[in-house]
Amino acid sequence: QHWSHGWYPG
């Protein structure tokens, strides 16, 4: 899974 929250590479 990949998220785009800023702390995770997404």
Curated annotation (Swiss-Prot):
Glycine amide: residues carrying this PTM: 10
Keyword line: Amidation, Hormone, Pyrrolidone carboxylic acid, Secreted
Subcellular localization, as worded in the UniProt entry: Secreted
Matches recorded under Pfam families: GnRH
InterPro entries linked: GnRH
Pyrrolidone carboxylic acid found at: 1
Family from the record: Belongs to the GnRH family.
Protein's name in the database: Gonadoliberin-2
Originating organism: Gallus gallus
